[in-house]
Every structure is written in C-alpha cells, then in structure tokens.
C-alpha cells in the first residue's frame, strides 16, 4: 500500500482517505499512520476526513485515549475537529460505559462552538440507559433534544424501546410502539427489538402478533428475527415448532449462530433424532458459513465422545487445528470428560498437563471434572494431588472432594476440609455436611459425629457474624 502510494506522486487527498479507511477497517492502524506520513511527504495533505477516519479506527480497536491524541495532531495541522470527530470519540467512550468521559467530550464540543446532532444525543441516551440511569436518559429525550431544535427519529426510539424491553417493561415498549407508528415508520430493527423483548418474556402469542405486524409493514424477517424466535421455542420446550422454524430457515438459506445450532442439535437428540443431529452438525461445520465457530465444533466433539466414535474425535481435533481455531475452556472440558468416560484417566491427566504446557491456565470447571472423574475411578490420591496444585477453587471443587473423600472412607480428611471451607466463609451445599456427619456416625460413633457437628455449627455462626 505504501509503496503503491510512493509510485503515484499525483495522488489526491481523496485517494489517501480511501487508503487510510481501508487499512483502518482491517485494524492496521500502524500502516495507516505510515501512509499518512508518506502522503504528507509527497505533498498530499490530510483533511478532516483523514483524521476522523483514524480517530474512528482508534476508538474501535485501540482505545479512547489514543483516539483523542489524534485531535491534538489535527489542531497542530490547522484542522479543527468537527461533530463527526466528537461523535466517534463519544461513541468509543460510551461503548465502554465511560459516562464522565462522554459528558466531558459533550462539554468540549459545546465550548468549541459545535452543536451536537441526533447521533450525539442518541449515544449519550443509550449510555445512560445501559448504566440504569433512566431518568437522565428520558431528560435527554424530552428536554435536551427539543431545546437543541432536533426531532427524534426511529433510531432514537429504537434505543428507547430496547431499554424498556431490557429493563422488563415490555408492555410499555409495546404501547410506545403503537403510539409511534403514526409518527415515524418503524424499521426492521424496531420489530426485532420488540420480538427479542417478547421472546425473553416468553410471550409466544404476542410474538406471533408482532410477526404479523412486521409483515404488514412490508418487511421480511431476517436471520436475527428467526434466530431470536428459534431460541425462544427451544427454551419454552416448543421443540416441534422450533424444528419447523429451523427447517424453514434452512430452506430459505439463512445462517445461524452457534447457540441456535447447539439448541437445534440438543432438541433433535432429546426427541430421539440422533441421525438428524449428526447431519445438522456436519452440514454446519462443513458448509463454511460457521466454519470459524468453535462452539459448533464443541457440539460435534461432544456428540462423537458420547457415541464412542474416537476416530471421528481425532479427525475433528485435527480439523480444528488445521483451521487455526482456538479451543476454549469448554473444548478442553469436553475432551477431559470424554476421556474419563471411556476409562482413559491417564489421557485425561495428560491433556490437562498439555493445557499448562501451552501456556494456558486450565479452567476450574475442567479441573473439577478431572478431580471427580479420578475419584470415581478410584484414584483419590491422584485427584488430591491435582486439588493441591489448583490455584483457584470454587465451591464445586470442595463439594466434589468432600463427597469423594467420604465415599473413600477418609472421613477425618473430609471433615477437616469441610471445616476449613466454613472457616473461610465459603458457602458449601448442606449435602457435603450431611455426607461427613453420616459417615462419621456410621463408621466411628454418634458422639464423634456430634462433636464434628458442633464445630461446623460454630464455624458457620462465626462467619455469619463476620459477614452478615
């Protein structure tokens, strides 16, 4: 790109802007900066669009401070930031919920003699809503926007409808929608926002009504619309209706996100349609539309392990590596659990060791899975060594170890571990306490169990006083 620029000394600022914009879109800010310097050396001076493009790139991919630093360079070049400049900065700050920074930029814009536009106010209003400060958000809508002589558009109302739905006021959102229809034309996004709110409230009848409204307005549901409904059908156990919608989407060429596909596969398995589940996952992974989604591979990996198809597991893991996908915590947990289920405890331990060798920290869930599997296979000592090596443990870690120590007859060790949990203020399920006391009562004596119970009760009461 830079060499190409050097070859054409007659290039314009417009071409420079196109090149900078292209590099920024691909997150190559360093090359964009180099291109800008080369352009200046050739006498191609940047304009406000050039700097605004850089600022937008920095706010999206680097940080607000780095983006703001560009405004100083603008002024040094004799170019004053405009409303677009501040909108990019405000958007970057609002995205990270940096309200004070947003307000500071608003003040700076006003002091510079610039008037915020609807984008500016929409971004500020959205930030207030996301922070739960609805009063200030409504003040912008009812006062600030009108004082500025601006008229709210559908973008503004989309923000308001989304906030109402997310805060549980779906009925208010529907009433506002009915009121707005005579004033502004709803967008497809408007309907998707309301359908999402109704789906999360599990109001199936209202969702059907909103779909009819959407079609009456001349819109065609898109992948977002259908995927939202698909998730609701499966969450509300309307499996057949969900599968019908899935087949309709598939027929019409829609693509799905990882969650939707996993939900479909899970529903197919629950209804005894394992072959269709395999076919669905194979199509998803091989089609290329979701080939970069590790969630999809995780689902297929889990299916292969459950079916005992280890050759397919090996092939799939090789494919994941070839495609450059990065296994997540769930991938590693599936592998460890799958190896444990076929009795390969050594392989499960080796896989956990490999995670550490790759410079990653195994998740607590993966470690918990291995500890429980080792104990169930009778390798309690190996499980305890892993337990001792863990830097982070949760209540499930302790609960699993206590239960398994009791099953192995190591009641003294189990009771000491349980007491240490209560002394630290941890909330351990009562089932662990019952397992310890029952074991001591049956194998030692009722009196010993009574003494342990008194110690546990004292530890719980002590921590209740310290952390009420």
Curated annotation (Swiss-Prot):
Q: Keyword Transcription on this protein? A: no
Stretches forming PPR repeats: 12-46, 47-81, 82-116, 117-152, 153-183, 187-221, 222-256, 257-291, 293-327, 328-362, 363-393, 394-428
Q: Which UniProt keywords apply?
A: Repeat
Q: In terms of domain of life, where is this protein from?
A: Eukaryota
Gene3D superfamilies per the UniProt record, alphabetical: Tetratricopeptide repeat domain (1.25.40.10)
| A matching Pfam family | PPR
Determine if Repeat is one of this entry's keywords. yes
Family named by the database record: Belongs to the PPR family. P subfamily.
NCBIfam families linked: PPR
Name used for this protein in its record:
Pentatricopeptide repeat-containing protein At5g46680
**According to the entry, what is the taxonomic lineage of the organism?**
Eukaryota, Viridiplantae, Streptophyta, Embryophyta, Tracheophyta
